[in-house]
């Protein structure tokens, strides 16, 4: 077995059971990995120097094929309603079979770190079958200094072999695709999928398990910080504007997706970004667009024309086209990945029912309620003529990645908000003047004006009214914003229709939250929409 590149000489792949490999390439850099990926036919070179790969059958995550080893340590720690279990015995058979499958292969290894805060960092070794996967994860996680590699000690190892097909009977899984996580021993096995995002989200899942034990809050969010050190956190599901609204030329970007919150402040888990590329335009998102024209960026499932120019409007392979690039490709990105204690939390929702106000102030209890709810609404199946909005509740704004019970994260968040005096806002980027099909999308200039007032603190001085349906505080007037739009009922042509729609949404919140009722205290239960109205 030939071994190339810089590494800790005392920790080779044989230490985790690999044998009879052809060549192992440790910590290769972008130019080397380009050469490998192109020579092996894994990817194409684009006209502007990015690397473009296709993932085949799997163009997104496979949440139904993700498993956590259920053992003595995890049995009482994992939220099994939301996480599928695999036995230690099945996992061991899977591990041995994957190691046997790798015999004769050339593999790529990256020694990286999850977490910009040294006290809460997770040194991670990623072993991949594909060279482009090695570059992808090198872009996404934090790269240690080259001088640190000879002493690198991983606490988590990820083995990603897309050509391995799992056997559902033999391996105790659902299909040929498997993402199996042994939290006790720090090992993740990925097989049967070429989708690179599985590696990134596996690191996130492990950090989401480990950090609460240290009273550190892991978050599926973006974050930025102003010139005065005023950190803001943006929670929000896909399509709510999290990436767009946190990209502010007047503020430093900490990160776009995964962060931790400790007693010292906020820190990015990653060293890169994994941005959606479908319908990407230079006019709308110039900074992200510019990364697609840089050497080192990895594009996933983006269609190229015969001149090797990307067509970002072509979703024929998938709507989930992506580009992965190091954070330093963004001009105003933080060099440290850390920021002071948050002053503001923004919870984004795209309410397609058109009943939520464009902004509302939340108490700590209401913030926990809405964090556990993780609400947005999307317009489902419009291409088939279905125009009825569909409510989506994804707890903690990232249910697929939360191994512990949501109440653990919710209580951590509530305590951190109270301890640091953080102001929380719910921001609706969805519809106004009616539901989807009748109303219109909330103007982005209105959202930005309200966000600016929230972030600079001036909105705290506004006059507020209590919303009759949801119980939160809504500003009556904000400079530069038409007062009428702040009261959603007044924007509807039919006030009675608004009341009916609002009550329907309140009922959806209550029905969804029923599963959390016994896990939260009375103050959070009392923060439910409709609770205040019922009490009065």
Swiss-Prot record:
Record-listed substrate binding positions: 61, 195, 201, 322
Source domain of life: Bacteria
Cofactor binding note of this UniProt entry: Binds 1 Mn(2+) ion per subunit.
Primary subcellular site in the record, as a coarse category: cytoplasm
Top-rank EC class of the record's enzyme: lyase
GO cellular component: cytosol
Residues at which ATP binds: 201, 220, 236-244, 285, 322, 447
Enzymatic reactions: oxaloacetate + ATP = phosphoenolpyruvate + ADP + CO2
Record pathway: Carbohydrate biosynthesis; gluconeogenesis
Keyword Methyltransferase: no
Record key words, sorted: ATP-binding, Cytoplasm, Decarboxylase, Gluconeogenesis, Lyase, Manganese, Metal-binding, Nucleotide-binding
Chain sites annotated for binding Mn(2+): 201, 220, 257
Names of required cofactors: Mn(2+)
Localization annotation: Cytoplasm
A Gene Ontology biological process term: gluconeogenesis
Pfam families from the UniProt entry: PEPCK_ATP
Record EC number: 4.1.1.49
A GO term for molecular function: phosphoenolpyruvate carboxykinase (ATP) activity
UniProt-listed InterPro entries: PEP_carboxykinase_ATP (IPR001272), PEP_carboxykinase_C (IPR013035), PEP_carboxykinase_N (IPR008210), PEPCK_ATP_CS (IPR015994)
The UniProt record lists the keyword Metal-binding: yes
Assigned protein family: Belongs to the phosphoenolpyruvate carboxykinase (ATP) family.
Function: Involved in the gluconeogenesis. Catalyzes the conversion of oxaloacetate (OAA) to phosphoenolpyruvate (PEP) through direct phosphoryl transfer between the nucleoside triphosphate and OAA.
Name this polypeptide is given: Phosphoenolpyruvate carboxykinase (ATP)
């Amino acid at each position: 077995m030939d071994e190339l590149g810089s590494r800790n000489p005392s920790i080779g792949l044989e230490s985790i059971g690999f044998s009879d490999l052809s060549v192992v390439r440790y910590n290769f850099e972008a130019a080397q990995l380009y050469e490998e990926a192109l020579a092996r036919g894994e990817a194409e070179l684009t006209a502007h120097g990015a690397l473009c790969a296709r993932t085949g059958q799997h163009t997104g995550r496979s949440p139904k094929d993700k498993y956590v080893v259920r053992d003595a340590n995890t049995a009482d720690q994992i939220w099994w309603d939301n996480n599928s279990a695999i036995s230690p015995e099945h996992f061991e058979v899977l591990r041995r079979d994957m190691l046997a499958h790798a015999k004769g292969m050339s593999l790529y290894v990256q020694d990286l770190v999850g977490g910009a805060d040294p006290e809460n960092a997770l040194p991670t070794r990623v072993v991949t079958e594909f060279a482009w996967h090695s570059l992808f994860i090198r872009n996404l996680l934090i790269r240690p200094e080259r001088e640190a590699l000879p002493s690198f000690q991983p606490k988590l190892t990820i083995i990603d072999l897309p050509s391995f097909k799992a056997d559902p009977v033999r391996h105790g899984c659902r299909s040929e695709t498997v993402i199996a996580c042994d939290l006790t021993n720090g090992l993740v096995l990925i097989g049967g999928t070429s989708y690179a995002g599985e590696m990134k989200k596996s690191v996130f899942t492990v950090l989401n398990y480990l950090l609460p034990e240290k009273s550190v809050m892991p978050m599926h969010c973006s974050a930025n910080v102003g010139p005065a050190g005023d950190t803001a956190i943006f929670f929000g599901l896909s399509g709510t504007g999290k990436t767009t609204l946190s990209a502010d030329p007047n503020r430093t970007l900490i990160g776009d997706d995964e962060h931790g919150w400790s007693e010292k402040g906020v820190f990015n888990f990653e060293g890169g970004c994994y941005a959606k590329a479908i319908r990407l335009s230079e006019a709308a998102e110039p900074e992200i667009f510019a990364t697609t024209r840089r050497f080192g960026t990895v594009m996933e499932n983006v269609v190229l024309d015969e001149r090797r120019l990307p067509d970002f409007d072509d979703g024929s392979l998938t709507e989930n086209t992506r580009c992965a690039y190091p954070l330093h490709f963004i001009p105003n990105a933080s060099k440290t990945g850390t920021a002071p204690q948050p002053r503001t939390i923004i919870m984004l929702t795209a309410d397609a029912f058109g009943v939520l106000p464009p902004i509302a102030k939340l108490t700590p209890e209401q913030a926990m309620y809405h964090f556990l709810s993780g609400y947005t609404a999307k317009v489902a199946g419009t291409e088939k003529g279905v125009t009825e909005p569909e409510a989506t509740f994804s707890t903690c704004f990232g249910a697929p990645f939360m191994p512990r019970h949501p109440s653990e994260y919710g209580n951590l968040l509530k305590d951190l908000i109270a301890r640091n005096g953080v102001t929380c806002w719910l921001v609706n980027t969805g519809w106004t003047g009616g539901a989807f099909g009748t109303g219109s999308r909330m103007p982005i200039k209105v959202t930005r004006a309200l966000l600016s007032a929230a972030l600079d603190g001036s909105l705290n001085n506004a006059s507020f009214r209590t919303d009759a349906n949801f119980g939160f505080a809504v500003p009556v007037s904000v400079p530069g914003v038409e007062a009428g739009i702040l009261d959603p009922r007044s924007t509807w042509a039919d006030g009675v229709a608004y009341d009916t729609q609002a009550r329907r949404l309140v009922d959806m919140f209550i029905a969804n939250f029923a599963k959390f009722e016994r896990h939260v205290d009375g103050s959070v239960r009392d923060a439910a929409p409709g609770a205040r109205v019922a009490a009065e």
